[in-house]
A protein has these predicted regions:
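Glycine-rich Rossmann-fold phosphate-binding loop(s) that bind the pyrophosphate
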Residues: 155-156
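Rossmann-like dinucleotide-binding domain for NAD(H)/NADP(H)
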Residues: 91, 172, 219, 228-318
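N-terminal glycine-/charge-rich "phosphate-binding" loop or analogous flexible N-terminal tail
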Residues: 1-45, 170-174
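Short beta->alpha connector loops at strand-helix junctions that form conserved
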Residues: 31, 72-73, 89-100, 177
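Phosphate-binding beta-alpha-beta segment of Rossmann-like dinucleotide-binding domains, i.e.
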Residues: 87, 95-149, 316
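N-terminal Rossmann-fold NAD(P) dinucleotide-binding loop
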Residues: 159-160
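Rossmann-like adenosine-cofactor binding region
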Residues: 55-61, 179-272
């Protein structure tokens, strides 16, 4: 059984091993694979594992030996799952491996804004505190989370983890979700999308990317938000219209934008968000803690093992 990993570096730059996979077959690892290389590298594989290498219908048609695609991530929009099913290829993902890490990054971004961490670190380096007349130095207000309203769009594993952390900060938590109110904890208020937009001091996105959620936050919806609102996106870049967000920041119609994801990755250096001082952007690292990648690595092998035993798990194209 030949197992080919097409873009192994992001999930495993060398601090993990593949011994669990190697017990299941011949493993070939490529750090990165371009569009021009993917067919040649995957043509003899029974199993391919990938993170962000695109597998569209045209590519899959050139891989008649392929039996299984293991996506080394939770999102599975990199694979045409309908075409894969038509071709008899099972596709699996890795749910919930990064829940704690992504929730942690969500609050790292929020606290970076509310506590002005970057600003005051730089001010210290510029000796502003050293030459200050008072025992402390601050020139711009900080914000306490207790009593503020956190709005959550998407109340899956990560959204619920974020909600629980917010509760510990003393925040009021509301959510726009398809879940019934009776299935939610009593301390989470279910509201409409417009209600969430209008009342949230901080709005955080944890939705999957789909036709319905593409540019969920656009010019029209930003106009419904508070001018001081903090928008957080650790879900998928295209959930927001980045041009509209950049303009809202520039026009002071949005307090801050915090994101670990962007519409194009790697992003263009011309992206207008890079010009906005109230845009706090990290390079898609929320999932990448050692602990989360270790869980990912183990679950990838578990998915492959289950497939080989005839009882596939975490299938996204049943």
């Amino acid at each position: 059984m030949k197992i080919v990993i097409l873009d192994g570096y992001a999930a495993n730059p060398g601090d993990l091993d593949y011994h669990l996979l190697e017990q299941l077959g011949e493993v070939v690892v490529y750090p990165r694979t371009s569009d021009d290389e993917k067919v040649e590298r995957a043509k003899d594989a029974d199993i391919i594992l990938l993170n962000k290498v695109q597998m569209d219908a045209e590519t899959l048609a050139q891989l008649p030996n392929l039996k299984y695609i293991g996506i080394q991530a939770t999102g599975f929009n990199v694979v045409d799952i309908k075409a894969a099913k038509k071709q008899g290829i099972i596709v699996t993902n890795i749910p919930a491996y990064s829940t704690d890490s992504v929730a942690q990054m969500t609050f790292a971004l929020i606290l970076a804004v509310t506590n002005r961490v970057e600003h005051y670190t730089q001010e210290n380096r510029n000796d502003r505190w050293a030459y200050n007349k008072d025992f402390c130095y601050w020139d711009t207000p900080l914000m306490e989370l207790a009593g503020k309203k956190l709005g959550i769009m998407g109340l899956g594993n990560i959204g619920m983890k974020v909600a629980n952390i917010a509760r510990q900060f003393g925040m009021d938590v509301c959510a726009c979700t398809s879940k019934n109110s009776c299935d939610l904890p009593e301390w989470i208020q279910k509201v409409s999308k417009d209600g969430l937009l209008a009342t949230s001091d901080i709005l955080t996105l944890h939705c999957p990317l789909s036709d319905d959620t593409y540019h969920l936050i656009n010019k029209e919806n930003i106009e419904k938000m508070k001018d001081t609102a903090i928008l957080v996106n650790t879900g998928r870049g295209p959930l927001v219209d980045e041009e509209a967000v950049a303009k809202a920041l520039h026009d002071q119609k949005l307090g801050a934008y915090c994101a670990d994801v962007m519409s194009q990755e790697p992003p263009s250096k011309e992206n207008p968000l890079f010009k906005e001082p109230n845009a706090y952007l990290t390079p898609h690292i929320a999932w990448a803690t050692f602990e989360a990648r270790k869980r990912l690595n183990r679950q990838v092998a578990a998915n492959v093992k289950a497939f080989l035993e005839g009882n596939p798990i975490n299938v996204v194209n049943p």
